[in-house]
Amino acid sequence: LLTEVETPTRNEWECRCSDSSDPLVVAASIIGILHLILWILDRLFFKCIYRRLKYGLKRGPSTAGVPESMREEYRQEQQSAVDVDDGHFVNI
């Protein structure tokens, strides 16, 4: 963090050391550090994070109380839908 701030005066540049005991400076420093850490983590793991947000939350309807045969039929329907979607991609 920057602890020295150069401010122009009428005659010359003087070096004014900011006092880090100021609560506003402390809060801004903490927020800045947290923002930097979160940004770095986001850039490093964005594929994993957004894939999980996109597909992890779509788990389908609850299967509580549904017979196993119907669950298996539902799984096969979902898989066949995925297989059909794969046919739309063209390899170049």
Curated annotation (Swiss-Prot):
Cellular component (GO) terms are:
host cell plasma membrane; membrane; virion membrane
Subcellular localization(s) per the UniProt record: Virion membrane; Host apical cell membrane
Q: Region Disordered: which residues?
A: 60-86
Q: Which residues lie on this side of the membrane: Intravirion?
A: 42-92
Q: Indicate yes or no for the key word Transmembrane.
A: yes
- Lipidated positions (S-palmitoyl cysteine) are C48
The residue spans the entry assigns to the Virion surface side of the membrane are as follows 1-20
Site description Seems to be involved in pH gating, residues in chain: W39
Q: Which GO terms describe its molecular function?
A: channel activity; proton transmembrane transporter activity
What superkingdom does the record give? Answer: Viruses
Protein family membership: Belongs to the influenza viruses matrix protein M2 family.
What's this chain's function?
Forms a proton-selective ion channel that is necessary for the efficient release of the viral genome during virus entry. After attaching to the cell surface, the virion enters the cell by endocytosis. Acidification of the endosome triggers M2 ion channel activity.
- Indicate what this protein is called per its UniProt record: Matrix protein 2
Source organism of the structure: Influenza A virus (strain A/Teal/China/2978.1/2002 H5N1 genotype W)
